[in-house]
UniProtKB/Swiss-Prot annotation:
Topology class, membrane: Peripheral membrane protein
Quaternary organization: Homodimer. Forms a complex composed of CDPK1, PKA regulatory subunit PKAr and 14-3-3I; the complex is formed in merozoites in response to low extracellular level of K(+) and may play a role in microneme secretion. Interacts with CDPK1 (when phosphorylated) in a Ca(2+)-independent manner; the interaction does not regulate CDPK1 catalytic activity but is required for merozoite invasion of host erythrocytes. Interacts with PKA regulatory subunit PKAr (when phosphorylated) in a Ca(2+)-dependent manner.
Protein's name according to its UniProt entry: 14-3-3 protein I
Function: Adapter protein which binds to its partners, usually via a phosphoserine or phosphothreonine motif. Binding generally results in the modulation of the activity and/or cellular localization of the binding partner. Via its interaction with CDPK1 and PKAr, involved in merozoite microneme secretion and thus in merozoite invasion of host erythrocytes.
Single annotated GO MF: kinase binding
Keyword Transmembrane: no
Gene (UniProt): 14-3-3I
The organism's place on the tree of life at top rank: Eukaryota
Family the entry assigns: Belongs to the 14-3-3 family.
GO-annotated biological processes: protein localization; signal transduction
Coiled-coil features, chain-numbered ranges: none
Main subcellular location: membrane
UniProt source species: Plasmodium falciparum (isolate 3D7)
Amino acid sequence: MATSEELKQLRCDCTYRSKLAEQAERYDEMADAMRTLVEQCVNNDKDELTVEERNLLSVAYKNAVGARRASWRIISSVEQKEMSKANVHNKNVAATYRKKVEEELNNICQDILNLLTKKLIPNTSESESKVFYYKMKGDYYRYISEFSCDEGKKEASNCAQEAYQKATDIAENELPSTHPIRLGLALNYSVFFYEILNQPHQACEMAKRAFDDAITEFDNVSEDSYKDSTLIMQLLRDNLTLWTSDLQGDQTEEKSKDEGLE
């Protein structure tokens, strides 16, 4: 059993290693460092992550998954083109490669979901952190649903919606409408409605409500939150423009914007 001093040193070392890995753009190793920190150091609500640690965790997994999500989209597109050309051999090669990326994606998503479910969510008492972690849980189940099929897709989608809704219930009661975490949640939850559930009207309604609520209270936005809040509000507005255009029958190849790295 490690002493409190040893755990404190481990926490500092993991944070430093994570920052080094981020500077070197080695995001898998950044995630490894933050996983070690969470597994070894978060055992009750007195041990919960600082804002800096929480953000390092988020950046690590977001980038590790983001690169593979982009790869998956490219490979899937190539696979579809080979299929349309009836090139069975190349289509099969692309499919095998796609499945390899899907396995990597699934492993990373399950890794962070395990940390969220067993360590982070049970051991936090702060409303802001609860919203942050439930939003993350929704995001990573959403990513799983992007590449899953049939029952796997349905199960991941249900888990994502449940997590997003829990985050929303807390955020709407505990966080101001201009808070960047609440805005980011509305952004990603609305993308989930649009991209995964194929419910564009609900997506537009959610994004518009979040944007309008924030505009109403924008004079009260804190100086610390101003930059992040305005950026997310712009993404909400961009999506609303795109989705409204789609609903009016103007087809576009442009993809919805969320806080994930595309």
